[in-house]
């Protein structure tokens, strides 16, 4: 392969002088120059590939935020639309890139997960409280002054309640 580089005569003299000072032949200098150029170009291609991947992921995340934002219906952002209710300007369609950096973003899906978790934890807390109460009664019932009712006491209480209701009925009948 033969490469020809046309350089003005004054630049050629300076180039030859610099090559002699650095101890490199002009052909070797051209070879190093080409290597540097293609290495830089290859590195630039790698960074653009990374940049394209970053932009692709950012677009995916932005689209997901548009779909699952609590304040978005997919076409307009409620926060932006109702920001200035009294102005006559038309609402602008939602921009995914604006949603990407939105401070008010709230995921709709997390609300559902939280309520399900809250319901489960409340049920578990209730069961845990019942078990703890039974355990406390068994261990410390005597010290607390708790004495469970016997069957005969329960029957006596039921009869007393019936007797209390009976005079009211008699009063109503004997008016």
From Swiss-Prot:
**Which domain of life does the UniProt lineage start with?**
Archaea
Name of the protein in its database record? Uncharacterized protein AF_2022
Q: What is the lineage of its organism?
A: Archaea, Methanobacteriati, Methanobacteriota, Archaeoglobi, Archaeoglobales
